[in-house]
A protein has these predicted regions:
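Conserved ABC transporter NBD signature motif
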Residues: 65-73
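Short coil-to-helix "N-cap" segments within the ABC nucleotide-binding domain's helical subdomain
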Residues: 80-81, 104, 116-133, 142, ...
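Catalytic Walker B motif of ABC-type/P-loop ATPase nucleotide-binding domains
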Residues: 169-172
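ABC ATPase NBD coupling module
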Residues: 20-23, 74-91, 121-122
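Conserved catalytic motifs of ABC-family nucleotide-binding domains
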Residues: 165
Length: 239
């Protein structure tokens, strides 16, 4: 049975810092993401994009409001259950790849599988090899990540985000460190993964071309989503 929403949040509030330095980072944010769709969150630096992704990814709790995965609220879960839910249902891609530089491409992709603990070593090696083949790195699976180009490292990061076959992929500036050609390749790869696998993708980006190719664009300002636009809408922030 497929849930209506892969990921959703309602009335999220988040404060960062203490005392005089306390900042109201998210203000009543609500968002629904359905399977097979690609969403972009755009807005100026400091508007709350990354904070929102961390909360939706169950890496940081909200101060108020609710996050649900496949229509199931998660606030009641224990820390262990929350970690399992995160490992099983959510894949992450960041601007800086956070690869283990002395690990091979294959070993990096296997890290989330080892954490979840559901596959044998043989199965993990087979799945990681298949994922690297899917992102065009089948011939480099045994190469240490420090010997890969920036574009190749980001493709390893994409493969790693898919290690546990997540329902949702969250990407924080996934192409921000890449040149135009590699940015386009990485985003096209993510689009294909979403379309073919029925997954959902939410990414924070400053790249107009990438944002405008998404199914939905959500504009953020001062911790709020101020507007949501379907693909094809002219967005004022990019004019």
């Amino acid at each position: 049975m497929t849930s209506e929403f892969s990921l959703s949040c309602c009335d999220i509030e988040r404060y960062l810092g203490e005392d005089e330095s306390r900042v109201h980072a998210l203000r009543g944010v609500s968002l629904d993401i359905t399977p097979g769709t690609v969403h972009a969150v755009v807005g100026p630096s400091g508007c709350g994009k990354s904070t929102l992704l961390y909360i939706l990814g169950l890496l940081d709790p909200p101060d108020a409001g609710q996050v649900s995965i496949e229509s199931e609220p998660v606030s009641h879960l224990s820390d262990d259950a929350m970690a399992h839910k995160r490992s099983r249902f959510i894949g992450f891609i960041f601007q800086f790849h956070f690869l283990m530089e002395d690990f091979t491409a294959q070993e990096n992709v296997m890290i989330p599988m080892r954490k979840l603990g559901k596959l044998s070593d043989y199965e993990m090696r087979g799945r990681s090899a298949d994922l690297l083949e899917a992102v065009g790195l089948g011939d480099k699976l045994r190469r240490p990540s420090r010997h890969l180009s920036g574009g190749e490292q980001q493709r390893v990061a994409i493969a790693r985000s898919l290690a546990n076959d997540p329902r949702v992929i969250l990407a924080d500036e996934p192409t921000g460190n890449l040149d135009t050609a590699n940015s386009e390749r990485a985003f096209e790869l993510l689009q294909n993964i979403v379309q073919q696998g029925g997954k959902a993708l939410l990414l924070a980006t400053h790249n107009p071309a990438i944002a405008e190719a998404c199914d939905w664009i959500h504009e953020m300002k001062d911790g709020r989503i101020i507007a949501s636009h379907p693909r094809g809408t002219q967005i004022s922030i990019f004019k």
